Curated annotation (Swiss-Prot):
Pfam families: Ribosomal_S5, Ribosomal_S5_C. One of its GO terms (molecular function) is structural constituent of ribosome. Part of the 30S ribosomal subunit. Contacts protein S4. GO terms for biological process: translation. This is Small ribosomal subunit protein uS5. InterPro entries: Ribosomal_Su5_D2-typ_SF, Ribosomal_uS5, Ribosomal_uS5_arc, Ribosomal_uS5_C, Ribosomal_uS5_euk/arc, Ribosomal_uS5_N, Ribosomal_uS5_N_CS, Ribsml_uS5_D2-typ_fold_subgr. The gene is rps5. It comes from the Archaea. The N-terminal domain interacts with the head of the 30S subunit; the C-terminal domain interacts with the body and contacts protein S4. The interaction surface between S4 and S5 is involved in control of translational fidelity. Belongs to the universal ribosomal protein uS5 family. Residues 68-131 form the S5 DRBM domain. The keyword rRNA-binding applies. Disulfide bonds: none annotated. Residues 1-32 are annotated as: Disordered.
Amino acid sequence: MSHPQSRPGGRDGRPRRRREPREEAPWVPKTALGKRVNAGEITSLEEIQEAGARIQESGIIKKLLPDLKTEVVDVGIIQKMTSNGQSTRFKAIVAAGNENGYLGIGQGKAKQMRIAIEKANNQALLNVGPIKLGCGSWECRCDQKHSVPFKVRGKGGSVVIEILPAPRGLGLVAGGKIRRLLELAGLKDAYTTAKGSTPTTNSTSKAVLECLRQTFSQG
């Protein structure tokens, strides 16, 4: 018994068109600060911070730090009972860094995973700030920016993290997610200690970010 042969392509036999990846729409600034950045009047985040201006557009960060990378750190499901039954939402955590002294972390929640990630991505970009790199290890004392300049401590929820200077070539002595955040910030060598509920990604990420921002507030 012969079987009908399937024809390649779609239902009408025509070849399927390959979907091209969507190109990101060009940034059109909406704020006065964004317009100045887009016009080239402001060329660094330091200028914005010194002026005490508030960044409200992620496009500003992308324009000033074109080498910035964003990575999804964690995606989870939030379920709770409501009067209409069980409600399900997604929670995403995204990190943004250029592996050379800048890091930001954001969180987003939505009914769709994609939208939750987009919200977290945008928030991570808006939270990007400078990290002071250096060599604070008494075992090394070189002049390269491969570690932190001194011991720093940060807290997020129940999680407390310390980052200590390490000699060049040691690497990052840290757990997987903490290590990746340090890499995105630009650290190559460091000791770390962590206390509390470190599997809680949101608290751990906040603790790491606060830790690294101490490099400026203490310096």
